[in-house]
Amino acid sequence: MDSRLLHDLKRLLGADGVLHEPADLLLYEYDGSVEVARPDCVVFPRNTSDVVEIVRLANRHRVPLVGRGAGTGLSGGALAREGGIITSFARMNRILEVDVENQRARVQPGVVNADLSLAVAHAGLHFAPDPSSQKACTIGGNVSENSGGPHTLAYGVTTNHVLALEAVLPTGELVHLGSSAVDSPGYDLLGVFVGSEGTFGLVTEITVRLTRLPETVETLLAIYDSIDDATETVAEITARGITPAACEMMDGWTIRAVEEYVHAGFPLDAAAILLIEVDGLREVAEAEAEIVADVCQLHHARSVRVARDAAERDLLWKGRKNAFGAVGRISPSYYTQDGVIPRTKLPATLRRVGEIGRKYNLAIGNVFHAGDGNLHPIILFDERNQQQFRDAVRAADEIIEYCVEVGGSITGEHGVGMEKDRLMPLLFSEADLDLMKRVRSVFNPEALLNPGKIFPTSKGCGEIYVRPQSPVAAPPA
């Protein structure tokens, strides 16, 4: 990196606000995906003014710039694919304002998702998007990826809960999108910005909608001896006119991994479980819970139980939300995918996932948002074995290709990033992709902000078939 740029960044942020030594950069080569990319430096702004100056400096020196929250993303979105500066929002983590009466809050992008809900729980409110990483992921990252979570089924994704944004464009221009009003005139630039994966600008403030906590929550655990029976239950519940707050599925392999780690009370001999939640007014929630239990039993659930209290409910959800961590304890590496399919295609798709695993001799666990058909196959491999790594990537691609074949999508909530850019042509024509690039160029004309993301590049998929080793982490010769 140019020494003059480094000097200017240190003068702006102080020596403790800039990292550039190889050992210090190691953490920032990674996120939650299998991708690796090294930045030239990492900076830590304290406020919007710092971000404006960082962007202006990067623009002046023609250096790529990438925003980063907690680094929990699963598509390489927060990695510096082409080097340059990573802007970490770890120090911009304040809840600036809470308006209980109007059910909204204004926050900096580094606020942790779960921390906001904890801060407003006393008022009977919460922030509805709930990714499994909600105890670590940031609201700024949620905005960039348009994150969802188990309760997306009833409450929607992040864009449904964002009222307004303050953002810095790649030119250093500060813009305000949306408003606290129910609707605002003009083009829906806010809607375009949310989910743009950091390619339009760096978000510095977010006004979010807060949602009332439901009067009653009924959480059911249904246990099955057949995966097909579990998947058919999901379609039947929605066919009965019930939209659960959440409807999660876990297969037998994942159940055993989770139970050894969390001890949530999942039966080790089950082929699958469904974790279903209905909420709302007491009479409605209790009635819907009875219908859901009946449907589960109609489809041969071995047993159905309702959580007796909040403690039991929290334990069940702890099991679900720690699934990825549980897998990490028993495998050197794992690759989490994120495809979407119609609910009616769940049985066939899970069978196909099993076939792909056997083809490559790889174990694949399944834990996912069954209610909206958002799959998260977890492919186990050892990254020290390059052939296993290549096979894991090929297996992941084949799973996503099948999702598209049956009428689904290449991603539901993890984003495209640098992981799936090569798969975009499965869904979009050249004309479609060109139109998207033209929209990006309105905000980011020089493509200096988060370059190499979303759109296919000349590097193609070969870039991740041989995972580079960090010179810091590499063993001595």
Regions inferred by a protein language model and the residue ranges of each:
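A glycine- and small-aliphatic-rich helix-loop capping segment at beta-alpha/alpha-beta transitions
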Residues: S75-N93, A121-L125, G148-T159, I206-R212, ...
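Activity-critical C-terminal alpha-helical subdomain
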Residues: E173, D421-A477
